[in-house]
From Swiss-Prot:
Belongs to the queuine tRNA-ribosyltransferase family. Its EC number is 2.4.2.29. The active site is at residues 92, 267. This is Queuine tRNA-ribosyltransferase. One of its GO terms (biological process) is tRNA wobble guanine modification. Its cofactor is Zn(2+). Binds 1 zinc ion per subunit. It catalyses: 7-aminomethyl-7-carbaguanine + guanosine(34) in tRNA = 7-aminomethyl-7-carbaguanosine(34) in tRNA + guanine. One of its GO terms (molecular function) is metal ion binding. Catalyzes the base-exchange of a guanine (G) residue with the queuine precursor 7-aminomethyl-7-deazaguanine (PreQ1) at position 34 (anticodon wobble position) in tRNAs with GU(N) anticodons (tRNA-Asp, -Asn, -His and -Tyr). Catalysis occurs through a double-displacement mechanism. The nucleophile active site attacks the C1' of nucleotide 34 to detach the guanine base from the RNA, forming a covalent enzyme-RNA intermediate. The proton acceptor active site deprotonates the incoming PreQ1, allowing a nucleophilic attack on the C1' of the ribose to form the product. Zn(2+) binds at residues 305, 307, 310, 336. The lineage of its organism: Bacteria, Pseudomonadati, Thermodesulfobacteriota, Desulfobacteria, Desulfobacterales. It comes from Desulforapulum autotrophicum (strain ATCC 43914 / DSM 3382 / VKM B-1955 / HRM2).
């Protein structure tokens, strides 16, 4: 079973540092989890992930279930040996994919029936099946099946998704207990953009006593301030001693703000996806490497960055690679963006431990105003 120890609590905010201990190692929080949808973080190897100081990565249950499938995963001993990753893995339940591929999915009391986007075959995810598949994957942290509601949504729609999510959470938890509490299962708070519904969801899930909790249904098209409002409202409703995870978020600014609200875990495709689109994150903000201003620029992407890319290559060379659509561009850009995100979390942890989180936050924004 997972253990979570709170190391330091900021006196200036709800920010805190912690330590999650799993069967595959320790995770220092707050932490960002690179997304490896299909058992790979696109464009980089596990060795490069480790060099970027990745402590835990995320796998996608929906996609891995469809390809390569449970038979292959079971035969190979799970996702860890399959991809040669010996550190913790978190897997989602498929709920967000059913939301994003809504035309292919139907929500029922039993679970979610859906059509494969690969070959059109029909499948059913029940709360029990979602836990079973994640157990086959060997996830250190599994997510309960949830109903993610988009934005905007009516109160009636949000309430329906909340009720279904709670019912599924209880069923998934019961199955997890029957199977011997293999690995760890988190519940997911829903409730749309209605604070009172999120309070209800949080209380219901807290009563089920999961090892940790995710706050879902954010970053689904709502304004940033509304996302912050919902997160700020929800975090205190959940057990203080349990890790809290905001799913699918987000920008560097999002991470700083939400960590200040007491969020411990984050994931997002942004650093890797944006790297492939030429958008790079630096201590002074974002840059588009295709910009003509970098054609003769001999400087690194970020003078403050110690990543492999910044230590070895110029902006001019990286621009050339990207404009030429050379595959190396995607690798070097992704290494930099992941290093930036993970180093940002490292800096945050240090600041919280040293009692200067607010000073860190002010400096973070000051650099972006240059």
């Amino acid at each position: 079973m997972l253990t979570f120890d709170i190391i330091n609590q900021s006196l200036e905010s709800r920010a805190r540092t912690g330590r999650i201990t799993t069967a595959h190692g320790v995770i220092e929080t707050p932490i960002f989890m690179p997304v490896g949808t299909l058992g790979t973080v696109k464009a980089v190897s596990v060795e490069e992930l480790k060099a970027c100081q990745a402590q835990i990565i995320l796998g996608n249950t929906y996609h891995l279930y469809l390809r390569p499938g449970c038979e292959v995963m079971a035969h190979m001993g799970g996702l860890h040996p399959f991809m040669n990753w010996d550190r913790p893995i978190l897997t989602d339940s498929g709920g967000f994919q059913f939301f994003s591929l809504a035309k292919l999915a139907k929500f029922k009391d039993e679970g979610v029936s859906f059509q494969s986007h690969i070959d059109g075959s029909r499948h059913l995810f029940t709360p029990e099946r979602a836990v079973e598949i994640q157990s086959i994957l060997g996830s250190d942290i599994m997510m309960s099946l949830d109903w993610c509601m988009g934005y905007p949504a009516t109160r009636k729609e949000a309430m329906g998704a909340l009720e279904k999510t709670t019912q599924w959470a209880e069923r998934g938890r019961n199955f997890w207990i029957e199977q011997g509490r293999v690995n760890n299962l988190f519940g997911i708070v829903q409730g749309g953009m209605f604070a009172d519904l999120r309070s209800i969801s949080a209380r219901q899930l807290a009563d089920l006593d999961f090892p940790g909790y995710a706050i879902g249904g954010l970053s689904v098209g709502e304004p940033t301030e509304l996302m912050y409002e919902m997160a700020d409202h929800t975090v205190p409703q959940l057990p203080l001693e349990k890790p809290k995870y905001v799913m699918g978020v987000g920008t560097p600014e999002n991470l700083v703000e939400l960590a200040g609200m007491g969020v411990d875990m984050f994931d997002c495709v942004m650093p890797s996806r944006n790297a492939r689109n030429g958008q790079l994150f630096t201590s002074t903000g974002t840059m588009n490497i295709s910009n003509a201003a970098f054609r003769l620029d001999e400087s690194p992407l970020d003078a403050e960055c110690s990543c492999y890319t910044c230590q070895n290559y110029s902006r001019a060379y990286l621009r050339h690679l990207y404009k030429s659509r050379e595959l190396l561009a995607y690798r070097l850009n992704t290494i930099h963006n992941l290093h930036y995100y993970l180093d940002l979390m490292h800096q945050m942890r240090n600041a919280i431990n040293q009692g200067r989180f607010m000073a860190f936050k002010q400096e973070f924004y000051r650099k972006r105003e240059r």
